[in-house]
Amino acid sequence: MKKNVSYLTAKTLALCFSAQAQLNPAQPLSSAPPYSLFEQWAQPVAPFQMFPHVYYVGTRNLSSVLLSTPEGLILIDAALDASAPTIRAHIEALGFNIKDLRYIINSHARLDQAGGIARMKAWSGAKVVASAANAKQLALGGKQDFALGDALSFPPVKADIIVGEGDSVTLGGLRLTALMTPGHLPGATSWLTTLHQGGRSYRLVYADSLATPDYYLINNKNYPSLVADIRGSFLSLAQQQADIFIANKGTRFDLENKMLRLQAGDLDAFVDRQGLQQYVQQSQQTFEAQLKQQQNKM
């Protein structure tokens, strides 16, 4: 039976925020993308309703999704620290009150998904929800990243609720369930929920990154299970049936074209029953080619 998570025990807190393991000095790190790339991704777009009770409040390529319920709001991801004022303004432009935000859900703890969480939490008083590994990285502000070291830090923030596989957060009749999809980061988490509209049920999948950009895949001393983890995540996400597929980067779920279709009057523009499988297949092909290339160099 899936556990409904409503609080974080003192014991769990102690386990999650104990002393952090240092990175292995013998393991080379990957080159971090330039911050200018994130700034390009953070260009503004107007907020809009994607589907009843589901709103896009993020940037051009950094997803931030707001879910509304009779008991308050849930936010998934918060882009860059510099994006936080924009996300807040988007929420308020849609007619919502930032103080009604109850939960901030994290997919993975890097600056482009988690950078704005600290400010969003401070403004709203919402509880931050993350996997144990993500919670450690959130507390470190992204430092000691297994692939990037301290290159892309962000304002640290404490997680209030720790989730594992199959755990869920419930608010106002809406249940969000965690699907562990490690590989991009050890704590990477996708999120599942079911929406009800017009007498029908729609399965929404918010998929985390499946990318391994410039990672050292073979015998990575900072993340020995990387290859097994990402392959397991391909399998886990491929087994999901999504009516509405959202990813934490807009390009991964064709955000721009779907926005245009919505603006043209297609109210089902974000209903996409093939998108998740295509995303997984493309990601897996890219990964296997990257792995083969590294194996050939050995």
Label each PLM-derived region with a short phrase:
Residues 273-298:
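C-terminal regulatory/interaction regions
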Residues 54, 82-85, 92-168, 271:
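Active-site HxH/HxHxD metal-binding segment of metal-dependent hydrolases
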Residues 40-94, 98, 190-212:
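Conserved beta-strand hairpin/beta-sheet module of binuclear metal-dependent hydrolase folds
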